[in-house]
Amino acid sequence: MLIQCKRVYFPAEKDDGYRVLVDRLWPRGIKKAALIYDEWNKAITPSTELRKAFHSELIDFNHFAQQYRAELAQQHQEGKRLADIARHQPLTLLYAAKDTRQNHAIVLAEWLREL
């Protein structure tokens, strides 16, 4: 199972496989017609409240990841669908966050690998 995370601002590559935008909000500066993606999946993104708490630094990344995983547990079927895709082809999770080490796509990728 190959699941990778990639900033939405980086160019699409042949080996990206199935590309899923996993941000609730459309990325700034990207035209919808210009982005190469297979689906925009808002169902598996962090809630607005959780996203705002993390971005305003009211909670640290570990607390964010813990709460996000609790939210993801409510989206088990959607997670299984994406994990099944990843079993047959590469799955690329697209995100806009600047931090490439501490963001929701990393947490999501880990969760999907466990399904």
Give the role of each language-model region.
Residues 1-115:
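Residues lining hydrophobic/aromatic ligand-binding pockets adjacent to catalytic sites
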